Amino acid sequence: MAQNSHLILCVDDELVGLRVRKILLERAGYRVLTAMDGASGLSIFESEPIEAVILDYSMPGMHGGEVAGRMRQIKPRIPILLLSAYIGLPAEVTSLVDLYMTKGEGAPVLLKKLESLLQPVSTS
C-alpha cells in the first residue's frame, strides 16, 4: 500500500489498541513511535521528526484536545488525526485537529485518512 517511511506518532493509553495500530501502520509502510499518555507523546513530538500524529481523545491526565493544543503551539503544521470512542466531540477540540474519526470506523478508514493528511498540498 503506502510505500513511504513517514514517521507517525500514535498516542493512546490503551496498550492493546496502541499495539494493533502500530502493527497496522508498520504493515502499511510507516515508521511508528508510540506513547501511552499525553506528556510522553509531547516529549516525543518535540524531539523527533514526526510527520503526523494519531491521537486518542480519552486519556488520563491530559485528554487528546489538550495534547493537540500543545502540539499546535510546538509544531503547528504537523497533521493530527484525533481518534475517539465518542461521537460528537466539542468544536473547541475538533478545531485543533486536521481530522477526527471514531475508533469504530476501522483500519481501512484510518489508513485512508492518514494517507490524505500526508498528501502534499497542491499549490495550483
Residue spans for each PLM region:
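Conserved phosphotransfer cores of two-component systems
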Residues: E46-E48, M71-R77, S95
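Receiver (REC) domain active-site loop signature in two-component systems and cognate sites
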Residues: M59
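Active-site beta3 strand of CheY-like receiver
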Residues: E48-I54
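Two-component/phosphorelay signaling modules centered on CheY-like receiver
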Residues: L15-L33
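Acidic catalytic/metal-coordinating carboxylates
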Residues: D37-S40, H63-V67
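Non-catalytic signal-transmission and effector/linker regions of two-component phosphorelay proteins
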Residues: M1-L7, P108-S124
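Active-site residues of response regulator receiver
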Residues: D12, D56
